């Protein structure tokens, strides 16, 4: 039975029961809107936007509440550590500010004070010991400038930069989420929330809340670079979605200098160029099938040539920091040796691809699980993830660029990442997943609040176990 005008179906219910996609991934154009949708979208030449107090202002409030909650949890964790310190890292902290700047934040502070070493420290076995080349310079540079300009402690400046970047990130993520939801309904990426879009606006805000209270989200109020790097990454994705490829270049460069995101970002931008070029070619073949195939292929390539040059530049940004390390130390593999040395490996041991997952879990299980079972588990994990990403709900909810970024970053982790206790934090760049998770069960009143509550409990556990907990449990190093 058709829905009554007074109570239309939600956009998610409509997407799950209508519309289709022609392949395992979304096409560049959303499914053609229905006649009813076209009338609704075009009936007013000047559509009325929802007021700010219903869109980006709630996004800021959600983020501020999450930050306040995390700060209170950090204060409680500090009090517990001072009474009963479980970790050598967390003993005798003079106050909360110091507590927010432990672990990797200390390396960023060292970069600000001493810059990078000219010689790599070596262990007895020849592997490179822990050193600051493993960390990108941007966060240290910005927080250092803030500290110098205002004459404040670098630790306070680092936390302040993270808080400011986090608030900006809340607005950018909200815009990306609402734009992705609008794309499915309108056929194009539109970051406006109009009157009549209340359902999509609520889902976008809930998705932001799920992300803001996710297990590793407390890191956004510390001296770590995550808030700044995720902001720059989200802005890079926004530039790609909107086709702002010139603006993308400086933003992508800053992203690559904030965290080791240059490789997956370059892969994403390059594959997006290929996606756009193939789509242009297919559109030409559909519109004018009588034209020569090579002529259409050349026209599609020529039309996207500038985008290709931009993609190649973005790929090159991944080599800026390694090149800096090579020039300063005189050792061409300085950055690679540092990264491998963090897990007590040497360059001559070679970089493991995929296999590091099996080897690391073999260490965790102390060799009690056969390697064939762990390999089967890894293959199952990879196939399950991409099967989930290929489902109709996923393909029709995420804008293709957000879908492609998620797929690229996940692939990067499967290929290169050494799974440690830091994996929860390393998953923060896949922010589109919070939109997917929040959009399930559209009729449930309890689902999304329970998601936020589960994330809050998870963040408290993450903080107590990894930030203020013991350094080691059995063979597992507990690092945030």
Positions of predicted regions on the chain:
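Membrane-lumen/periplasm interface segments of specific transmembrane helices
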Residues: 66-84, 265-387, 398, 402, ...
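Short hydrophobic/aromatic helix or loop-helix immediately within or flanking a transmembrane segment
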Residues: 99-121, 125-151, 350-352
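Loop-to-helix entry region of an early transmembrane alpha helix in multi-pass inner-membrane enzymes
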Residues: 127-133, 137, 141, 149-171, ...
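Transmembrane-helix motifs of polytopic, lipid-linked glycan transferases
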Residues: 144-145, 157-185, 190, 382-390
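Transmembrane-helix signature of polytopic, membrane-embedded enzymes
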Residues: 153-156, 174-213, 231, 247, ...
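Multi-pass, polyprenyl lipid-linked donor-dependent membrane glycosyltransferases
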Residues: 161-164, 179, 206-235, 247, ...
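Membrane-interface transmembrane helices that cradle and orient dolichyl/undecaprenyl
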Residues: 193-194, 198, 236-247, 441-442
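Transmembrane alpha-helix segments characteristic
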Residues: 393-416
